[in-house]
Amino acid sequence: MYHSLSETRHPLQPEEQEVGIDPLSSYSNKSGGDSNKNGRRTSSTLDSEGTFNSYRKEWEELFVNNNYLATIRQKGINGQLRSSRFRSICWKLFLCVLPQDKSQWISRIEELRAWYSNIKEIHITNPRKVVGQQDLMINNPLSQDEGSLWNKFFQDKELRSMIEQDVKRTFPEMQFFQQENVRKILTDVLFCYARENEQLLYKQGMHELLAPIVFVLHCDHQAFLHASESAQPSEEMKTVLNPEYLEHDAYAVFSQLMETAEPWFSTFEHDGQKGKETLMTPIPFARPQDLGPTIAIVTKVNQIQDHLLKKHDIELYMHLNRLEIAPQIYGLRWVRLLFGREFPLQDLLVVWDALFADGLSLGLVDYIFVAMLLYIRDALISSNYQTCLGLLMHYPFIGDVHSLILKALFLRDPKRNPRPVTYQFHPNLDYYKARGADLMNKSRTNAKGAPLNINKVSNSLINFGRKLISPAMAPGSAGGPVPGGNSSSSSSVVIPTRTSAEAPSHHLQQQQQQQRLMKSESMPVQLNKGLSSKNISSSPSVESLPGGREFTGSPPSSATKKDSFFSNISRSRSHSKTMGRKESEEELEAQISFLQGQLNDLDAMCKYCAKVMDTHLVNIQDVILQENLEKEDQILVSLAGLKQIKDILKGSLRFNQSQLEAEENEQITIADNHYCSSGQGQGRGQGQSVQMSGAIKQASSETPGCTDRGNSDDFILISKDDDGSSARGSFSGQAQPLRTLRSTSGKSQAPVCSPLVFSDPLMGPASASSSNPSSSPDDDSSKDSGFTIVSPLDI
C-alpha cells in the first residue's frame, strides 16, 4: 500500500485507520473535490443541453416546413439519412404508415397501436386461462375439433417453432438480435402477421425484412431517451418515439411493407395465366425458367434479366444465358429480402432509404438489381459457371453503396439523373470460384442423399460383372450345356474350378482391381448417367469376349472374366487426366472472353469518335467554304488529313503498321520533275480529274477542266484508275490521295510541272507509277495508294 510523505503510520495500527493527515489539506481537497463535482455537473449539463438542441434542430430541419415530405425523400435518395436519428419516422412517412398531415400523427399512431394490441390478444391465447368458461368435451388437450382452443394452441405452437427457428439465425454476427426480448418481439410480430394473413402465412425470409425495421426503431428510441434526459421533448416526439411500443410500431411498418412484397412470397399462380396454360401448348425450345409455374417473383426476375439487363448490357445477358444461369438461382433471394444478404446492415439501411423514398411500389428494386450485375460484369464475363455462381450467391463488398443507387437511378431515367462515375470492381476470382464450387458440391450432396460405401459399391460392381459375363459364356461351350444345370449353374461351376496355385494370384489381382475401382471417381457417375452401356453390354459380342473369334469351348477362369470387365472400368482413369486440361481450357476461354469484351469496347469507342469527328468536320468545312480565307487551301488539306484519321477509326480505311515506322523516319523529298518522271500525265487527260472545291459540297462537275471558283487555288483530285472512271464527289468520306494541280477553264488538263513537289515517304518512289486502283472508304475499300500534294501558292 502506497502512502504519501505527509502520512505517518504506526506499525501496529490497522490499515483501515488513517492518521497524520493534515486537516487543512483534507479540507482543501474536500473543497476542491466539491468544486470539481460542480464543474463536472455543469459540463455534463451543457453537453446534454447541446445534445437536445441538436436533436430538436434535426427534427425541425426534417419535419417543420411546408414541403417536408419532398425534402426527406430527396435526403433518402441521396443517402443523407445514414446518421439520422429520425429514420424510423421517415420510413413511416415513405410507406404511408403516417399521414402527411402532422396534426394527425398522434391519433394515427394510437389507432395502429390499439389495432396490434387487439390482434395480439386474439391470436396469442393461453387455453388454461379460459378453460373454465368452455365446454371440456371440446376444449381439452386431446380434442381434434377445429373449434377447440387446445387444438388451435398446438397448431400455433408448431407455427411459432418454425418462426423461432428462423429468428435464431437472424443476423448472427450482431449481438442485438441475440437478446431474448428482441427474439420474442420478432417472433410475436411474425406470428401475428401469419395469423392475420392465412392465405400467405409465414414464409422463410420474412424475418429478414422485419429485423432491420426493429433495429431502426430501437436506435431511434435510444436516441430519444438520450436526448430527453436534459430537456422536455414535445408531445409529438413522446408519442411517436415511445420505446414501450416498439413491437406495435414494428408490426405497423412491416405489414405496410408486405402490402408490396406479398406477391414475392406467394406461391400461388396468377389466375389469368391459369386459363391461358390450359389452351396453350408448351413452347418449343423454351428455357427451363420459362416452363415453370407462373409465380409473380419468377416472372419478375425473368423480366429483369430478359428485358432490362438485355437492354443495358447485351453481352452480359448472352454470357449468363450461355452458362444457363437462370435468374431464379440468385434473383429470388435478392428481391424477396430486398438485398438483405448482399450488403452489411449499415449499407443495407442506406439502400432501403432509397427504395422506400422512391415510392411505395418499390420500383427501384429492378434497377438496383441490374446495377448490381453491371457492377461485377467484367468479373462475370471473364469467369466460368462456378465463379459466376459464387459471385452472384456471395455478392462482393461495395465500398460506396450510394454509387450503386446513383447507377440505378441513371439506368431508369438517364435524362433526369446524371451519369455516375464508373465504379470498377477488382475481384479475387479464386475466392468466388471456391465459393461456387462449394455451392455445387452442396447441391450435389443434397441431391444424392445418404453417402454410399465404396466397398459395397465395388463388391456390387464385381457381382454385376459376373452376372453380365457368365450367362453369355455358357451357350458357347463346345461340349454343349452342362447336364442338369442352366446358365446360372454353369457360372457357379466355373468359379470354383481353380488350381491351388491360381487362387492366391487371383486374390491379389482382385484386391488390385478393387483399389483401382476406388481410385476411379468417374465410374459411378458414368453408371448413373447411363454411359456404362457404351462399355458394358448385357449380350457381349464375340470380339468383346476373351480370345476374340478364336474362342474355344473351354470356359475362361474367373480372373480372366473380371479382367474383361474391369478393363472397361480402367478406361475411365483417363477421364481424370483430362480434368486439368479442361480447367486450363476454361481459364483460357475466360481470358479470351475478357479480351473480347475489351476489343468490343475499343471498337465502339472508335466508331463513336469517327461519328463525332465526321459531324464536326462537315460543320467546319461548310463554314470555311462560306468564308473567303487567305489560307483556305491549307485548312482544307488539313481537313482531308483529319478525314483520313476518321476513316481509319471507322474501319473503312486500312491502317498499316508501316505508317508508324514511316512517321518516325519521315523525310520530305522535293523533285522538280516529279510529274514528268512519274508518267501520271500520259493518257489521263480525259475523265480523271475532279475539282476539290466542287467535291466538298457535291459532285456537281465531272468535266475535267470545269471549276466552281475558276482561280489558281483550286484542288484537283487525279484518279489513278486506268479505266477512266469518274471521280466520286463526296468529300466527307474522301480518303484517297490528293493532288493539287493548277487548272484553268477551257484548257486541257495536262499536269503542270511544279518546282516544289512533295513526295509521299510512305509509298516510296514506285508509288508514282503504280497502276493500282484508288480506294474510297465509302465503298468499304481498304487498298492503299500514294499521293503527292503541291501547294497552289508555290506554283
Curated annotation (Swiss-Prot):
Effect of changing residue 59 to A: reported as: Disrupts interaction with VPS29
- The gene it comes from is TBC1D5
Primary location recorded for the protein, binned into one broad class: membrane
Known consequence of changing residue 204 to A? Answer: Abolishes retromer displacement from endosome membrane; no effect on interaction with VPS29
Which GO CC annotations does the UniProt entry carry?
A: autophagosome; cytosol; endosome membrane; Golgi apparatus; intracellular membrane-bounded organelle; retromer complex
Which residue numbers mark the site Glutamine finger? 204
- The source's superkingdom equals Eukaryota
Identify residues that carry Phosphothreonine: 42
Which InterPro entries does this UniProt record tie to the protein? Rab-GAP-TBC_dom, Rab-GAP_TBC_sf
Protein purpose: May act as a GTPase-activating protein (GAP) for Rab family protein(s). May act as a GAP for RAB7A. Can displace RAB7A and retromer CSC subcomplex from the endosomal membrane to the cytosol; at least retromer displacement seems to require its catalytic activity. Required for retrograde transport of cargo proteins from endosomes to the trans-Golgi network (TGN); the function seems to require its catalytic activity. Involved in regulation of autophagy.
Region named Required for interaction with ATG8 family proteins? 786-791
Q: What is this protein called?
A: TBC1 domain family member 5
On this chain, the residues bearing Phosphoserine are 43-44, 460, 522, 539, 541, 544, 554, 570, 584, 730, 791
Which residues lie within the region annotated Disordered? 1-49, 475-564, 674-795
Named from the GO MF annotations, one term is: GTPase activator activity
Residues covered by the Rab-GAP TBC domain: 81-359
Compositional bias ranges of the Polar residues kind? 25-49, 523-542, 554-564, 727-748
- Keywords linked to the UniProt accession: Autophagy, Cytoplasmic vesicle, Endosome, GTPase activation, Membrane, Phosphoprotein, Protein transport, Transport
Indicate which residues form the motif LIR 1: 57-62
Entry's Gene Ontology BP terms: autophagy; macroautophagy; positive regulation of receptor internalization; protein transport; response to starvation; retrograde transport, endosome to Golgi
